[in-house]
């Protein structure tokens, strides 16, 4: 006999993912401008230090562009930079989720992200 519960767990995971997408869309609701979101893991201070350095570089390069750090609960081991547009679409500037070990591969050079941001804004 097949073990029970697998189907329900898979459905729950899909529902949770859909809810997360909806929350991200709703958090951007009423947003009238383009925003940069940095999601980083909170398990280690290295993630936070790199997120702060990246956020500072983005603010220096585009001062009119708001930068949000961890607007929702971050995923474990994540370091992502996303550009949220007013129309609800998003563009991934950097993802370090599948990178590493070593951990330093998860973090981009700030200049790389700034160049990627310029591509999407122009």
Swiss-Prot record:
Cross-link (Cysteinyl-selenocysteine (Cys-Sec)): 41-44
InterPro entries hit by this protein: Selenoprotein_Rdx-typ (IPR011893), SelWTH-like (IPR052674), Thioredoxin-like_sf (IPR036249)
Pfam family, one: Rdx
Sites bearing N6-acetyllysine, chain numbering: 20
Record has Hydrolase as a keyword: no
Keywords attached to this entry: Acetylation, Redox-active center, Selenocysteine
GO cellular component terms, A-Z: Golgi apparatus
Role according to the record: May be involved in a redox-related process.
NCBIfam families: CXXU_selWTH (TIGR02174)
Family note: Belongs to the SelWTH family.
Name of the protein in question: Selenoprotein H
Organism from which the protein derives: Macaca fascicularis (Crab-eating macaque)
